Amino acid sequence: MFGWAITFLVIAIAAGIFGFAGLAGTAAWIAKVLFVVGLAAVLIMLVMGRRPPTV
């Protein structure tokens, strides 16, 4: 998930350099969304992993 976020961030930076403002904004928004989703997934996995085993 974080790999995709970094990919879209690089696309946003490259598009911004070449003057494609609309594409840069969209790619940056996608990168932010993927980062937040990935961060939420990591936090959920941490919380789920800390539960004691049920017998």
From Swiss-Prot:
InterPro entries: DUF1328
Record-annotated membrane-spanning stretches: 1-21, 28-48
Main location: membrane
GO cellular-component term (any): plasma membrane
Compartments where found: Cell membrane
Coiled coil: none
Keyword tags: Cell membrane, Membrane, Transmembrane, Transmembrane helix
Membrane topology: Multi-pass membrane protein
Family: Belongs to the UPF0391 family.
NCBIfam families with a match to the protein in the record: PRK13682.1-4
Protein name, per record: UPF0391 membrane protein Tbd_2772
